[in-house]
Amino acid sequence: MKTNQNSVNSLNKILFVNFSKFALGLTLCIGLTLTSCKKDNDLPTPDGAALTEFFETNREESLQTFTLNATTGGVITGSEGTKVVFQPNAIGLNGNPVTGNVTIQLIELYDRSGMLSLNMPTYGSKPNGDHEVLKSGGEFFLNAIQGSNQLELLIPAEIQSRGVNPADFENFQVFRAGDDIKATDLWEEADEDGDGETDDAQARDGQGTAGGFVMYNAFDTSAFGWTNLDRWYNYTGATTQLYVDVPAGYDGDNCSVYLTYDGEPTALARMDIYDEDTELFTEHYGRIPVGQAVHFILVAEIDGVLHYTIQAATIVNGHTEIMAEPQPTTQSQLETLIDALP
């Protein structure tokens, strides 16, 4: 049987065109798949465990240690000027005074860069459950050990904040936030004497290290752990709920978001709620003043390198801050940037 050559050529042409379309389509599909995978692989992989370790390591490295005779008591002075006064036989174990030398441990924080590096923001819980930012006059961790034994205070110790110029002095109340160095509790008003009232620090005056006249706050603590000189921010006027939208790949498990208030160098709030449905950070009760000038700070650790974003903003009603992609930095560089904020 004789085959029509034109028909064969036409069929081959159709088959070639169809195969070419198929091959092109397959190539496009593979290309899109590879591109999608590449984009997924390009997403940052913040390490939440490494960030937690970063904070905890900073706390351990910030510990100052002093040797004190527990029988006679005495005074220790931190590198930032904090003083702690111990009465004789004030330190004990299982309710009994210890004798001989003990090791006193102290952390003192007076600026928001240190507060952020140790993840100790000035964010408190009111008796009614509301959460609100605090203005701090100093955060302190105090502890005592003897060998491997954790000790206790049998008689309250007095903590004295560093001295400041009388024109800069403010009265503060006393807050507590957990006994352990790793504590992440919110600050709560202290009531050491049990009278139902928040303890007020006492205003004192004296001679500073440079010889000038200074004022400082002093208060008693009956337990080791974290204490803070604070007052509630107590702003007036309209407030709003605040939201922070972090870049893809970041969430409540692998990064931290903080808020500084312009003009308040010792106030540092943390956005402590992450909504997995909306993928937004927020805080509890909408206590952010409308019109407040602030700076948002996003911190994460990626492949062993600290990353950050700092953004200035003025709060508007229903504010949502969209954070830019964090950039690599060092701890010292980040602290310098934070200390330079208004």
Segments predicted by a language model, with ranges:
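Bacterial Sec-dependent N-terminal signal peptides
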Residues: K2-L11, T27-E61
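Intrinsic-disorder/low-complexity regions
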Residues: T3-L11, V17, T184, A190, ...
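Sec-dependent N-terminal signal peptides
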Residues: N12-T27
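Proteolytic cleavage junctions
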Residues: D40-G81, N89-V102, I107-L116, G124-P342
